[in-house]
């Protein structure tokens, strides 16, 4: 995942993200993923060492051969030949060409879900800035409910003059549109990002693109954006849409502040009936 709004990246959802140095980005837009730090971790793995970031999977695998870690689940989507190529084609110092990439353009979001925080939602951010930090709330050491997440959007809600977003567009137009199998866009809420709609407009002008687009959405944007998303799917050869809920009705609305259950359900049906979806 690359969080373009904050200029951070990680290759898995278990390790913490690290900053992408702008100096590395100036040398190559591929540094959005191929940071010098990741290359050192890559070398550790090739040398048979265990990077500390991967301890979650090591612990699972050390429990016995019948225990399957996320490392296996994340790799099974690729063929054995593709995995072998990834190991043998590149020296650890080289920039790896990606097959899948997940990005978040920014943290703009119209929800404040209870399991989220201000680093990933501007609604959370605005709540803490207006009402102050949550008090007497048991949380982890990151103090997620005490901070306003300002580090996550240093370039503002419109990503003005963001070198990370600029690097993505350069990489996308020159290489990624030809080499990727899947591009996934998450958030925040994807439909609230102007860069997301820039990507949608690009696809409408380039409908022959073979890349599969996957979008994570809360399916709760304004009706005009919902219709725009539905219409845009017809410009794609392969469009996957992901949404989720942990409960139904009032319980779902309690967990996801901003959600209107009936609207979400209606939008799910709308996308399935009117959208051009490969997978939902």
Give the label of every model feature segment.
Residues 169, 200, 226-230, 265-272:
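Generic structural signal for well-ordered alpha-helices
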Residues 1-78, 97:
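Accessory C-terminal segments flanking Radical SAM cores
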Residues 170-176, 200-206, 230-233:
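Leucine-rich repeat
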Residues 81-92, 161-174, 223:
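A Trp-anchored, charged/polar loop motif used as the substrate-binding/catalytic surface
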Residues 64-99, 109-111, 132:
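Recognition helices and adjacent regulatory flanks at domain boundaries
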Residues 52-55, 107-114:
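Cys/His-enriched microdomains
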Residues 98-108, 119-164, 178-194, 206-225, ...:
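Core AdoMet radical
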